[in-house]
C-alpha cells in the first residue's frame, strides 16, 4: 500500500501501476507486451495467468492424524475454469487507491484485493516459464529455462563437430559391409 500511496502524489489517477514479484524473474518481453496491449484496455485491470493443466484435487486433512502431510482427496475439481495467477498484474492508480484505502488485508495478490470490491480483472495468457521461485527445485527449473533461452542444454557440456574417416579396402573383394549389409 505504501508504494501505491506514494504514487498518488506524483501520478495521474488514470496512470497504470504494474506490480511484479521479484521472485518471478523469468517473465518475457512477449508476455509483458501481451499484458500491456490487452490489459491497458481493461477498466478493472489485468493479470498474467496460465490455465491449470494438471488434474485438480481438493484435499481434506485427516484430523485423526497430527500430520500436515496426511491429506486425502475430497473431490476432483473441473479444471476448465481454473487459472494460476502470475505477475505482473496491472491496475489504474485510482483503482488500487480505492481498494487499499483504510483497509486491513489478507489478500495474496493485488487482483484478489481488486476482486474484493466487485471488480473483475482480465486474465491474460502468461507463460509456464514465468515460474515463482520459492524452493530450491523452483530455482533449478528457472535456471533450466534460462539455459534453454540461451541455447544451452542443462546439465550437459556438449560439443558438436564434424570429421571424416578414410580406410583402404582390403584385397579380399571390392565391397564394404555397412550396418550388416554387403555393399
Question: PLM ranges: what are they?
Answer:
Residues 14, 59-71, 111-112, 164-180:
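Acidic-glycine-rich active-site phosphate/pyrophosphate-binding loop
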Residues 121-126, 131-134:
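Conserved active-site beta-strand element of glycosyltransferases/polysaccharide synthases
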Residues 1-14:
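Short phosphate-binding loop-to-helix
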